[in-house]
Amino acid sequence: MSDFGHTGFSIDDLPLRDDLRGQAPYGAPQLTVKAVLNTNENPYPPSPELVEAIGRAAAEAAVGLNRYPDREATALRQALADYLGHGVDAANVWAANGSNEILQQILQAFGGPGHKALGFEPSYSMHPIIARGTATEWVSVPRTADFDVDADAAVAAVKEHEPSVVFLTSPNNPTGTALPLATVEAIAAAAPGVVVVDEAYAEFRREGTPSALSLLRTYPNVIVSRTMSKAFAMAGVRLGYLAAHPAVVDALQLVRLPYHLSTVTQAVALTALRYADELLSAVATLRAERDALVDWLRAHGFEVADSDANFVLFGRFPDRSAVFQHLLDQGVLIREVGPPEWLRVTVGTPEEMAIFREALLTATGRA
């Protein structure tokens, strides 16, 4: 890499914030291997028909690329509201470049110096990273041994720390655990600020597992965040969104950058929503593959967390890094994340899962 003639100049020579010194950026490996099962992507690409429709939409949008996009993303927000249901309207919806930008805007608006964000870990690793990036104090509360959130302990933690933002992830990443609505309600009733229910994997929930969308009318401090990266198989589009009281949307508009959602992004996302039935048709297949994987892992002596997502957390391994590397050596990329002794695998195609099963048995000496 070029040093532009300044030999020896490094990040340490920059006026970096003290709390960022020595930190590492987020990064999941991006490798070309037989089975990519590490970032919880939907393994099924869009159909040729949808690819063509997206191409047409992008071409139509390109005609006006000399102009800024719709700053409010009005049509997209209405389409997202229609998809969500639960009486949600465009005024209740906000969209951004991936759900991470949604979470960042929430912390920009409600966090910052002198404010706290509280989460129940192990959980989504970006929550504390985004908190740090917005100079929000992060408070970590441990989950139970089975990766649940104890409602009484959670309420006690909220009352003790008085956070401006509480993060609840349901289904939880990396464990796959979904929260009962009663737990969310108890925390929402106790919280002095907003409660963000991160539902990135909501479409993969098992039958009977509720969404916090049903709480929005009762609890105006509840925010439900979603994404089109998982069930919608649109990770490359970078489209996240939330549903909340209109006052929350008004607050986020104070911190959003102008014209933050490009014309092309809006056009592609709108097209994907018109093909929602087709895109979501793979969800049932992935659920069935997930449940079969859970049964297989348990039958082979592994400990497995119940999952309502498109991934499975399994263990336990005295040296999980060695198992991870053995799998990678066989062309299978999973994720070394979450509590020690555990690994996470994304649910892929039947062919990818067959490769994973064989590789795992070899890696653990059970072949």
From Swiss-Prot:
Tagged with keyword Transferase: yes
Pathway annotation from the record: Amino-acid biosynthesis; L-histidine biosynthesis; L-histidine from 5-phospho-alpha-D-ribose 1-diphosphate: step 7/9
Protein EC: 2.6.1.9
GO biological process: L-histidine biosynthetic process
Keyword annotations: Amino-acid biosynthesis, Aminotransferase, Histidine biosynthesis, Pyridoxal phosphate, Transferase
Pfam annotation, one family: Aminotran_1_2
Residues with PTM N6-(pyridoxal phosphate)lysine: 230
GO molecular function terms noted in the UniProt entry: histidinol-phosphate transaminase activity; pyridoxal phosphate binding
Keyword hit for Nucleotide-binding: no
Cofactor: pyridoxal 5'-phosphate
Tree of life domain: Bacteria
Oligomer status and interactors: Homodimer.
Family: Belongs to the class-II pyridoxal-phosphate-dependent aminotransferase family. Histidinol-phosphate aminotransferase subfamily.
NCBIfam families: hisC (TIGR01141), PRK03317.1 (NF002877)
Protein name per Swiss-Prot or TrEMBL: Histidinol-phosphate aminotransferase
UniProt organism field: Thermobifida fusca (strain YX)
